[in-house]
């Protein structure tokens, strides 16, 4: 089971939290679709800003958005000009008051989405699929990853028959629920068609904190 399921979804509620932190009864469907529009809009607007993921919180008529990015300067802009433009566009998109918080990702080479998108971008520039995977693995291990696995699938090198090739280093314990495993997939549009990129990065175990109030202590 651990080999097939999305490692992030499997660990939600155990060592990972939801990326949408709100609850609604009647308006759930409309708010969910609004979330999807917000995420798609941010992805399109900040395509070059190395955005890893977006967290959304709601309170009354206010939306708090946390953007995790490897290039915070590009998101904020000179004197906050770019983030102000983004905030105004999101205000118009949602008809609500939007607050944006930009969080910098310091180690971009052990963030699965940024690694996957970097591999996809290099594949679009006709780089060797073997070399880009090995370079990504090397950089991640140097930054302290416990293990990494990458896979590229499709018409590799323009071959007539599609196939998948994967490389790994270290351990990636997909069945261990306390293992902090980051996963992402990306697509590369090449002249021979689409190539799929998958990345799993194991960053160590997240140990549960002991509850000191147990046993009447």
Swiss-Prot record:
SMART domains noted in UniProt: KH
Key words of the record: Ribonucleoprotein, Ribosomal protein, RNA-binding, rRNA-binding
SUPFAM superfamilies: Prokaryotic type KH domain (KH-domain type II), Ribosomal protein S3 C-terminal domain
Disulphide-bonded residues: none
Pfam families: KH_2, Ribosomal_S3_C
MF terms in GO: mRNA binding; rRNA binding; structural constituent of ribosome
A single BP term in Gene Ontology: translation
UniProt-listed Gene3D superfamilies: 3.30.300.20, Ribosomal protein S3, C-terminal domain
Span of domain KH type-2: 38-106
Listed GO CC annotations: cytosolic small ribosomal subunit
Role played: Binds the lower part of the 30S subunit head. Binds mRNA in the 70S ribosome, positioning it for translation.
HAMAP family (UniProt xref): Ribosomal_uS3_B
Similarity comment: Belongs to the universal ribosomal protein uS3 family.
Assembly and oligomerization: Part of the 30S ribosomal subunit. Forms a tight complex with proteins S10 and S14.
Name of the protein this chain belongs to: Small ribosomal subunit protein uS3
Organism: Staphylococcus haemolyticus (strain JCSC1435)
Name of encoding gene: rpsC
């Amino acid at each position: 089971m651990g080999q097939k399921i999305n490692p992030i979804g499997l660990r939600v509620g155990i060592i990972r939290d939801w990326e949408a932190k709100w609850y609604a009864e009647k308006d759930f469907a409309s708010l969910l679709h609004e979330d999807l529009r917000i995420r798609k809009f941010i992805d399109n607007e900040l395509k070059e800003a190395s955005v890893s993921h977006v967290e959304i919180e709601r309170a009354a008529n206010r939306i708090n958005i946390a953007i995790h990015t490897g290039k915070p300067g590009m998101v904020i802009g000179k004197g906050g000009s770019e983030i102000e433009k983004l905030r105004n566009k999101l205000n118009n998109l949602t008809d609500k008051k939007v607050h944006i918080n930009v969080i910098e990702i310091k180690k971009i080479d052990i963030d699965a989405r940024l690694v996957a998108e970097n591999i996809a971008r290099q594949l679009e520039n006709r780089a060797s699929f073997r070399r880009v995977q090995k370079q990504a693995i090397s950089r991640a291990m140097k930054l302290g990853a416990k293990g990494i696995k990458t896979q590229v699938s499709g018409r590799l090198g323009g071959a007539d028959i599609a196939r998948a090739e994967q490389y790994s280093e270290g351990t990636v314990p997909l069945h261990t629920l306390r293992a902090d495993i980051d996963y992402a997939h990306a697509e590369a549009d090449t002249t021979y068609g689409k190539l799929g990129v998958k990345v799993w990065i194991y960053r160590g175990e997240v140990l549960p904190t002991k509850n000191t109030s147990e046993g009447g202590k």
